[in-house]
Protein backbone atom coordinates (compact mmCIF):
# COMPACT_ATOMS: atom_id res chain seq x y z
CA UNK A 1 0.00 0.00 0.00
CA UNK A 2 2.83 2.40 0.83
CA UNK A 3 4.54 1.60 -2.46
CA UNK A 4 1.39 2.46 -4.40
CA UNK A 5 1.02 5.63 -2.34
CA UNK A 6 4.60 6.66 -3.13
CA UNK A 7 4.06 5.82 -6.80
CA UNK A 8 1.04 8.17 -6.89
CA UNK A 9 3.13 10.93 -5.30
CA UNK A 10 5.95 10.38 -7.81
CA UNK A 11 3.47 10.65 -10.69
CA UNK A 12 2.04 13.79 -9.10
CA UNK A 13 5.49 15.40 -8.99
CA UNK A 14 6.25 14.27 -12.54
CA UNK A 15 3.03 15.76 -13.87
CA UNK A 16 3.84 19.07 -12.15
CA UNK A 17 7.31 19.00 -13.76
CA UNK A 18 5.74 18.32 -17.15
CA UNK A 19 3.34 21.22 -16.55
CA UNK A 20 6.30 23.52 -15.96
CA UNK A 21 8.12 22.35 -19.08
CA UNK A 22 5.46 22.37 -21.81
CA UNK A 23 4.91 25.41 -23.99
CA UNK A 24 1.69 24.63 -25.88
CA UNK A 25 -1.69 25.10 -24.16
CA UNK A 26 -3.12 21.73 -25.16
CA UNK A 27 -0.10 19.97 -23.66
CA UNK A 28 -0.68 22.00 -20.50
CA UNK A 29 -4.27 20.71 -20.42
CA UNK A 30 -3.08 17.12 -20.34
CA UNK A 31 -0.51 17.92 -17.63
CA UNK A 32 -3.12 19.71 -15.49
CA UNK A 33 -5.50 16.79 -15.89
CA UNK A 34 -2.74 14.54 -14.61
CA UNK A 35 -2.07 16.82 -11.64
CA UNK A 36 -5.74 16.97 -10.69
CA UNK A 37 -6.16 13.21 -11.16
CA UNK A 38 -3.22 12.33 -8.93
CA UNK A 39 -4.25 14.91 -6.32
CA UNK A 40 -7.68 13.29 -6.18
CA UNK A 41 -6.11 9.83 -5.89
CA UNK A 42 -4.08 11.24 -2.98
CA UNK A 43 -7.31 12.47 -1.36
CA UNK A 44 -8.86 9.02 -1.81
CA UNK A 45 -5.89 7.50 0.04
CA UNK A 46 -6.58 9.85 2.92
CA UNK A 47 -10.21 8.72 3.07
CA UNK A 48 -11.85 11.68 1.34
CA UNK A 49 -13.54 9.81 -1.50
CA UNK A 50 -16.58 12.03 -1.95
CA UNK A 51 -14.55 15.24 -1.68
CA UNK A 52 -12.10 13.90 -4.27
CA UNK A 53 -14.91 13.09 -6.68
CA UNK A 54 -16.58 16.48 -6.32
CA UNK A 55 -13.33 18.42 -6.61
CA UNK A 56 -12.29 16.41 -9.67
CA UNK A 57 -15.59 17.15 -11.40
CA UNK A 58 -15.51 20.86 -10.48
CA UNK A 59 -11.87 21.29 -11.45
CA UNK A 60 -12.18 19.46 -14.75
CA UNK A 61 -15.31 21.44 -15.61
CA UNK A 62 -13.45 24.71 -15.21
CA UNK A 63 -10.39 23.33 -16.92
CA UNK A 64 -12.31 22.24 -19.99
CA UNK A 65 -14.02 25.63 -20.33
CA UNK A 66 -10.88 27.75 -19.93
CA UNK A 67 -8.48 25.70 -22.00
CA UNK A 68 -11.06 24.82 -24.62
CA UNK A 69 -11.38 28.52 -25.26
CA UNK A 70 -7.59 29.00 -25.20
CA UNK A 71 -7.01 26.27 -27.74
CA UNK A 72 -9.78 27.56 -30.00
CA UNK A 73 -8.26 31.03 -30.26
CA UNK A 74 -4.65 29.89 -30.45
CA UNK A 75 -3.12 31.39 -33.57
CA UNK A 76 0.10 29.42 -33.74
CA UNK A 77 0.14 26.22 -35.72
CA UNK A 78 3.63 25.08 -34.79
CA UNK A 79 4.05 22.12 -32.49
CA UNK A 80 6.72 22.54 -29.87
CA UNK A 81 8.80 19.68 -28.67
CA UNK A 82 10.42 19.33 -25.30
CA UNK A 83 14.15 19.07 -25.74
CA UNK A 84 17.47 20.67 -25.04
CA UNK A 85 20.02 20.56 -22.30
CA UNK A 86 17.84 22.42 -19.78
CA UNK A 87 15.12 19.78 -19.87
CA UNK A 88 17.67 16.98 -19.87
CA UNK A 89 19.29 18.38 -16.71
CA UNK A 90 15.90 18.75 -15.01
CA UNK A 91 14.92 15.16 -15.85
CA UNK A 92 18.26 13.71 -14.74
CA UNK A 93 18.14 15.69 -11.47
CA UNK A 94 14.61 14.48 -10.77
CA UNK A 95 15.63 10.90 -11.55
CA UNK A 96 18.59 11.16 -9.16
CA UNK A 97 16.36 12.47 -6.37
CA UNK A 98 13.90 9.63 -6.89
CA UNK A 99 16.71 7.05 -6.93
CA UNK A 100 18.24 8.48 -3.74
CA UNK A 101 14.88 8.31 -2.01
CA UNK A 102 14.37 4.72 -3.15
CA UNK A 103 17.86 3.66 -2.08
CA UNK A 104 17.26 5.08 1.37
CA UNK A 105 13.86 3.36 1.41
CA UNK A 106 12.06 6.71 1.47
CA UNK A 107 13.22 7.32 5.04
CA UNK A 108 9.82 6.79 6.61
CA UNK A 109 8.31 9.90 5.05
CA UNK A 110 5.34 8.05 3.62
CA UNK A 111 4.60 5.84 6.60
CA UNK A 112 1.50 6.79 8.56
CA UNK A 113 0.82 4.51 11.49
CA UNK A 114 -2.62 5.64 12.66
CA UNK A 115 -4.76 4.92 9.59
CA UNK A 116 -7.70 4.36 11.94
CA UNK A 117 -8.03 8.11 12.41
CA UNK A 118 -8.72 8.62 8.70
CA UNK A 119 -11.18 5.81 8.01
CA UNK A 120 -14.66 7.23 8.61
CA UNK A 121 -14.31 10.73 7.23
CA UNK A 122 -17.01 10.32 4.57
CA UNK A 123 -20.00 9.56 6.78
CA UNK A 124 -21.79 12.79 5.98
CA UNK A 125 -21.03 13.02 2.26
CA UNK A 126 -23.25 15.57 0.54
CA UNK A 127 -24.44 17.06 3.82
CA UNK A 128 -20.95 18.35 4.59
CA UNK A 129 -20.78 20.15 1.26
CA UNK A 130 -24.17 21.76 1.78
CA UNK A 131 -23.47 22.78 5.38
CA UNK A 132 -19.84 23.62 6.12
CA UNK A 133 -18.24 22.81 2.78
CA UNK A 134 -20.58 24.97 0.72
CA UNK A 135 -18.44 28.04 1.24
CA UNK A 136 -15.44 26.14 -0.08
CA UNK A 137 -17.30 25.24 -3.24
CA UNK A 138 -18.40 28.86 -3.66
CA UNK A 139 -14.80 30.05 -3.31
CA UNK A 140 -13.62 27.40 -5.81
CA UNK A 141 -16.28 28.36 -8.35
CA UNK A 142 -15.48 32.06 -7.88
CA UNK A 143 -11.80 31.28 -8.49
CA UNK A 144 -12.64 29.40 -11.68
CA UNK A 145 -14.75 32.35 -12.87
CA UNK A 146 -11.90 34.81 -12.16
CA UNK A 147 -9.46 32.58 -14.06
CA UNK A 148 -11.88 32.36 -17.01
CA UNK A 149 -12.24 36.12 -17.28
CA UNK A 150 -8.50 36.69 -16.82
CA UNK A 151 -7.79 34.32 -19.70
CA UNK A 152 -10.40 36.12 -21.79
CA UNK A 153 -8.76 39.48 -21.05
CA UNK A 154 -5.29 38.11 -21.79
CA UNK A 155 -6.51 36.86 -25.15
CA UNK A 156 -8.14 40.26 -25.78
CA UNK A 157 -11.64 38.94 -26.27
CA UNK A 158 -13.14 42.42 -26.48
CA UNK A 159 -11.60 43.12 -29.90
CA UNK A 160 -13.44 40.55 -31.95
CA UNK A 161 -15.95 38.93 -29.65
CA UNK A 162 -17.79 36.13 -31.40
CA UNK A 163 -16.68 37.30 -34.87
CA UNK A 164 -13.15 35.94 -34.71
CA UNK A 165 -11.97 33.77 -37.62
CA UNK A 166 -11.11 30.15 -36.94
Swiss-Prot record:
Keywords from the named record: Electron transport, Membrane, Mitochondrion, NAD, Respiratory chain, Translocase, Transmembrane, Transmembrane helix, Transport, Ubiquinone
Sequence intervals crossing the membrane: 4-24, 27-47, 50-70, 82-102, 109-129, 135-155
Top enzyme class: translocase
E.C. no: 7.1.1.2
Keyword Transmembrane helix in record: yes
Primary localization: mitochondrion
Domain of life: Eukaryota
Signal peptide positions on this chain: none
GO function term, MF aspect, one: NADH dehydrogenase (ubiquinone) activity
Catalytic activities: a ubiquinone + NADH + 5 H(+)(in) = a ubiquinol + NAD(+) + 4 H(+)(out)
An example Gene Ontology CC term for this record: mitochondrial membrane
UniProt entry tagged with the keyword Ubl conjugation: no
Locations listed in the record: Mitochondrion membrane
Membrane topology of the entry: Multi-pass membrane protein
Family: Belongs to the complex I subunit 6 family.
Function comment: Core subunit of the mitochondrial membrane respiratory chain NADH dehydrogenase (Complex I) that is believed to belong to the minimal assembly required for catalysis. Complex I functions in the transfer of electrons from NADH to the respiratory chain. The immediate electron acceptor for the enzyme is believed to be ubiquinone.
Protein name in the entry: NADH-ubiquinone oxidoreductase chain 6
Lineage of producing organism: Eukaryota, Metazoa, Chordata, Craniata, Vertebrata
Gene name, Swiss-Prot/TrEMBL: MT-ND6
